[in-house]
Regions:
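The catalytic Tyr-centered alpha-helix of NAD(P)H-dependent dehydrogenases
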Residues: 140, 151-158, 188, 192-196, ...
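Short aromatic-enriched loop/helix-cap "lid" or pocket-rim segments at secondary-structure transitions
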Residues: 48-51, 135-139, 190-193, 224, ...
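N-terminal Rossmann-like NAD(P)+-binding domain of SDR-like oxidoreductases, especially those catalyzing
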Residues: 1-185, 315-319, 325, 329-339
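Short alpha-helical segment that forms part of, or immediately flanks, the ligand-binding pocket
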Residues: 99, 200, 219
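Structural element of the ATP-grasp superfamily
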Residues: 112, 166, 199, 292-293
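Residues in well-ordered alpha-helical elements
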Residues: 70-73, 92, 99, 110, ...
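Hydrophobic alpha-helix immediately C-terminal to the catalytic Tyr-X-X-X-Lys motif of short-chain
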Residues: 161, 165, 169, 199, ...
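C-terminal substrate-binding subdomain of Rossmann-fold SDR/epimerase-dehydratase oxidoreductases
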Residues: 10-11, 23, 64, 81, ...
């Protein structure tokens, strides 16, 4: 194992988004000596309420764009590391309009790497298992760090591009970097456009949930707090230049997840509508996190998916004021796409 890195001041890009804000909460709750600067553009998916109430002497919000090189030159000095979560990440949006994905996911990563190169700090790159493409439903294989890249959507192709930039800058310029590729996250603060919160909030509103295709597509679910603990372990204990896959053996097909949500909310498990499948919808994702567990000793804490799902449902029921402002615009966008 590498020498343990003990950062005192870190930048978290996208720290007002779903996964990024949960990482900020994790750091504040578990590592009291660390100060976090959140850099977030506050797009539709970034909500400052996600980090409201955290101690002001521990967390500072800088509203800005990761593509702004002058801004990065001002805020990066004095920090020990950047943890890069900021991304355009919704597949349906990438199909409708890929340009913002290229700018944020590719150019934004380039700008951050240049800032890291200039100021000599560490960098952890948060990525997705979607860069590997998909697996057959009857294939027992899982993605590993050696799986070839086969991105199949505008979103995943931009994330694959950003991963390659990190590797190239690491090799060419000697940057101190790590990369993680994670499976599908669930938990609090996730935007209502995403699969699980969309179903939950539709049921709260008395609207029949909608399911793509035949519902057979499989996702490997992980609670976002487990993702956060894994990223921290990789940042502080990971070997420089290495990639680690993060997963919790949470494979479920979409129809199973939807039926679990319906039953947990007291509804008939068949009370949903079928809609046309997403173009190019990946069939199955599955992560093998053996390397992460073996080298760094990481283990997921939220291994009961049904319990984690119940806690997530309870959070959305209790926090309608958080998700309500985005709900109508999100559903209008889905209606326009026939979904």
């Amino acid at each position: 194992m590498s020498e343990i890195f003990e950062p005192k001041n870190i930048i978290v890009t996208g720290g007002c988004g779903f996964i990024g804000s949960n990482f900020v909460h994790y750091v504040v709750n578990n590592h009291p000596g660390v100060h976090v600067t959140v850099l977030d553009k506050l797009t539709y998916a970034g909500n400052p309420e996600n980090i409201a109430g955290l101690p002001e002497d521990r967390v500072e919000l800088v509203v800005g764009d990761i593509c702004d090189a002058e801004l990065l030159d001002r805020i990066v000095p004095g920090h020990d590391a950047i943890v890069h979560y900021a991304a355009e990440s919704h597949n349906d949006n990438s199909i409708a309009d890929p340009e913002p994905f290229l700018r944020t996911n590719v150019e934004g990563t380039f700008r951050l790497l240049e800032a890291v190169r200039k100021h000599g700090i560490r960098y952890h790159h948060v990525s997705t298992d979607e860069v590997y493409g998909d697996l057959a439903l009857d294939d027992p294989a899982k993605f590993t760090e050696e799986t070839p890249y086969r991105p199949s959507s505008p979103y995943s192709s931009t994330k694959a591009s950003s991963d390659m930039l990190v590797r190239a800058w690491t090799r060419t310029y000697g940057l101190r970097t790590t990369i993680s590729n994670c499976s599908n996250n669930y938990g609090p603060y996730q935007h209502v456009e995403k699969f699980i919160p969309r179903q939950i909030t539709n049921i709260i509103d008395g609207v029949r949930p909608k399911l793509y295709g035949k519902g057979e597509n499989v996702r490997d679910w992980i609670h976002t707090e487990d993702h956060s603990s894994a990223v921290w372990d990789i940042l502080t204990k990971g070997r420089m230049g290495e990639t680690y896959l993060i997963g919790a053996d949470g494979e479920k097909n979409n129809i199973t997840v939807l039926r679990m949500i319906l039953e947990a909310m007291g509804r008939d498990p068949e009370d949903f509508d079928w809609v046309a499948d997403r173009p190019g919808h990946d069939r199955r994702y599955a992560i093998d996190s053996t390397k992460l567990q073996r080298e760094l000793g990481w283990r997921p804490a939220h291994t009961d998916f049904a319990e984690g799902l119940k806690q997530t449902i309870d959070w959305y029921v209790a926090n309608e004021s958080w998700w309500r402002p985005a709900k109508e615009a999100t559903e209008a966008r889905y209606r326009a796409q026939g979904q």
